[in-house]
Amino acid sequence: MALSEAAVKVQAALQERGLETPMLPNVFTPEERKDKIEFHMKEILTLMSLDLSDDSLADTPRRIAKMYVDEIFSGLDYENFPKITVIDNKMGFDEMVRVQDISLTSTCEHHLVTIDGTATIAYIPRKKIIGLSKINRIVRFFSQRPQVQERLTQQVLVALQTLLETKDVAVKMDAVHYCVKSRGVMDSTSSTTTTALGGIFKSNPATRAEFLNQSK
C-alpha cells in the first residue's frame, strides 16, 4: 500500500533532521513478521523454562507477535500513519491552540518495558489548522515504537511543524519509565519531563512562559 502524502512528508522531515527511529528497510509483510516473531518468542520462553504446552502459555508467543506488529510497535510502519485533516486558516485565527493531558503509552527501546505519561501540545496557526483529534493520533503513532522520550518529543514537534507549515509548535511530555520503576534502581515515584519548542515558543520568552506555566 502506498504511503499517504502526510506520511511521506513527515518521514522525510525526520530523516533530514536525523530524528527518525533507527530502522532497517521493511521487507516482510505484517503476517510474515508475526510468524517470525512467534517462532523466536517460542524459543525465548522455552529457554526460560516455561512449559508452552500449558493451556495458559500455549498461545502466548502468538499473542506477543500480534501485539508487537498490530499494537505497541505499529508506529514503525508508516502505512499506519493517521489520516490527517488540515484545513486552510481562512478565519485568520492567530492565538495559541493548546491540547493538554494527551495520554501516551510507549516502550523504552533499551529494555522494552512501558513508558506511561501525558503530552501537552500547542501551536499558533499560520496558514493551516489541524483537526484536534489528529494531534492525539500523531502522539499515539510515534509512541507506538521502541522509543526514548527525548526523540519522541522531537518527532511529534517536527511532524506537526511539517503538517502545519509553521515552526510555532511546542511539545511537553511527562512520563514514568518502567525501566526505572520496575527494574534497576526501582524508583517508583520519579517521572521525566521533556520539552521541544519551535519558532516563537523558543524565541519569545513570554510565549514560552505562557506555554510552560500552563502545562504544570
Curated annotation (Swiss-Prot):
PANTHER family (alphabetical): GTP CYCLOHYDROLASE 1 (PTHR11109:SF7), GTP CYCLOHYDROLASE I (PTHR11109)
Family: Belongs to the GTP cyclohydrolase I family.
GO cellular component, one term: cytoplasm
Keywords: GTP-binding, Hydrolase, Metal-binding, Nucleotide-binding, One-carbon metabolism, Zinc
Recorded superkingdom: Bacteria
A Pfam cross-reference name: GTP_cyclohydroI
The protein's name in its UniProt record: GTP cyclohydrolase 1
InterPro entries: GTP-CH-I_C/QueF, GTP-CH-I_N, GTP_CycHdrlase_I, GTP_CycHdrlase_I_CS, GTP_CycHdrlase_I_dom
Enzyme nomenclature, EC number: 3.5.4.16
Source organism (scientific name): Shewanella sp. (strain ANA-3)
Pathway it works in: Cofactor biosynthesis; 7,8-dihydroneopterin triphosphate biosynthesis; 7,8-dihydroneopterin triphosphate from GTP: step 1/1
Gene Ontology molecular function: any one: GTP binding
Keyword match Hydrolase: yes
Group of enzyme by EC: hydrolase
Disulfides per UniProt: none
HAMAP family reported in the protein's UniProt record: FolE
Known catalytic reactions: GTP + H2O = 7,8-dihydroneopterin 3'-triphosphate + formate + H(+)
Biological process, per Gene Ontology: one-carbon metabolic process; tetrahydrobiopterin biosynthetic process; tetrahydrofolate biosynthetic process
Record's signal peptide: none
